Amino acid sequence: MCSPSETKTSVIDQLKRAASAEEFFTTLGVDYDPQVVNVARLHILKRMGQYLASEDLAGLSNCAVTERCKAVLERAYADFVASSPLDQRVFKVLKDAVSPKRGAFVPLDALK
């Protein structure tokens, strides 16, 4: 639950001012493994942004927004605890860099 001091400044404003991924975790009260964050900090925050984009936060209290943001950060973080940034392919450069292997193509007219 939110305390009165947490409701004075919008959590979105606090996150906009955050200078590091660790500040996101601290602001939202999410526990994390520093090793996971060191490897995937940008990926986690990008995924959090993707998840937040699908949330409707309009008209919610700051406490409700904080809880939603916390849940979204936990979900994004869990994605990278369970797998690597390369597996998740959040950024276009990773999506394009290593394409999944395709089966060999043999045209029918090559078979005789």
Curated annotation (Swiss-Prot):
Sorted UniProt keywords = Nitrogen fixation
The source's superkingdom equals Bacteria
InterPro entries to which the protein is assigned, alphabetical: NifW
* Statement: the UniProt record of this protein carries the keyword GTP-binding: no
- Report the Pfam families cross-referenced here: NifW
Q: Which GO terms describe its biological process?
A: nitrogen fixation
Family annotation (NCBIfam families): PRK00810.1
What does the record give as the function of this protein?
May protect the nitrogenase Fe-Mo protein from oxidative damage.
Family named by the database record: Belongs to the NifW family.
Give the quaternary structure: Homotrimer; associates with NifD.
What is this protein's record name?
Answer: Nitrogenase-stabilizing/protective protein NifW
State the organism of origin.
Rhodopseudomonas palustris (strain BisA53)
